[in-house]
Amino acid sequence: MSAANMPTTTGAQGSGNQVPTTSTTIVNHFRELIKEPKNLDEAANYLYQSLLDDAVVGIFNETHHLRKSGNLAALDGVPEDSTYRMCEMPNLDIFGISTAKKPMDCTCPNCDRLVAAARFAPHLEKCMGMGRISSRIASRRLATKEGATSAHLHSSGNTGGTDDEDDVDWSSDKRRKKSNQNSRNNGSKKNNGKTF
């Protein structure tokens, strides 16, 4: 049975549109054909033909609708770009990028020298004076500068200093005492048999 021979029913709103019968109508007609054993082949063919016609008509309607609305190209999907194909050449990876090791050199922004990438960070620290050794030298320089400044302030008679600057440095006396005790022992730390 073709789509043209299928019985149709009117739409629910009475708009006059003809739609194919529902599945209940097909099943009811199939049950009538099964009642007689000699009509089993006809019933199976009817059911198969009805399902096939319904599927084909559905695909045709959907394709027609997509073509009229301009969305038929979306049904095909996105074509594969040639830029994303795998490359199978020697010394290249699958994306076509060379796998050979290149010497990576960086230009120092401070001195404009070419430096190997592995040595760039240590070079930049030394070049800009921000490395560990440079910071130690800078902190020593600041300490000596502060010491000279505070000695200069004390010698000029400036009384505007803080209480900490006016205090006596007790740590230097402790160092002297230790050195005096070591000289009493003649440089040895042994008790030499003396008891206290």
Swiss-Prot record:
Location of the region described as Disordered in the Swiss-Prot/TrEMBL record: 1-22, 141-196
Gene Ontology CC entries for this record: cytoplasm; DUBm complex; nuclear pore; nucleoplasm; nucleus; SAGA complex
SGF11-type zinc-finger residues: 106-127
Consequence of gene loss (knockout): Defects in the number and migration of glial cells located within the lamina plexus of the developing eye; the lack of glial cells causing mistargeting of the R1-R6 axons in the optic lobe. Lamina neuron development is normal.
UniProt xrefs under InterPro entries: SAGA_su_Sgf11, SGF11
GO terms, biological process: chromatin organization; mRNA export from nucleus; positive regulation of DNA-templated transcription; protein transport; regulation of DNA-templated transcription
Keywords recorded for this protein, A-Z: Activator, Chromatin regulator, Cytoplasm, Metal-binding, mRNA transport, Nucleus, Phosphoprotein, Protein transport, Transcription, Transcription regulation, Translocation, Transport, Zinc, Zinc-finger
Pfam families linked to this entry: Sgf11 (PF08209)
Subcellular location: Nucleus, Nucleoplasm; Cytoplasm
HAMAP family, sorted: Sgf11 (MF_03047)
Subunit structure and binding partners: Component of some SAGA transcription coactivator-HAT complexes, at least composed of Ada2b, not/nonstop, Pcaf/Gcn5, Sgf11 and Spt3. Within the SAGA complex, Sgf11, e(y)2, and not/nonstop form an additional subcomplex of SAGA called the DUB module (deubiquitination module). Interacts directly with not/nonstop. Interacts with the AMEX complex component xmas-2. Interacts with Cbp80; important for promoter recruitment of Sgf11 that is not associated with the DUB module.
Name of the protein in question: SAGA-associated factor 11 homolog
Source taxonomy: Eukaryota, Metazoa, Ecdysozoa, Arthropoda, Hexapoda
Gene transcribed to yield this protein: Sgf11
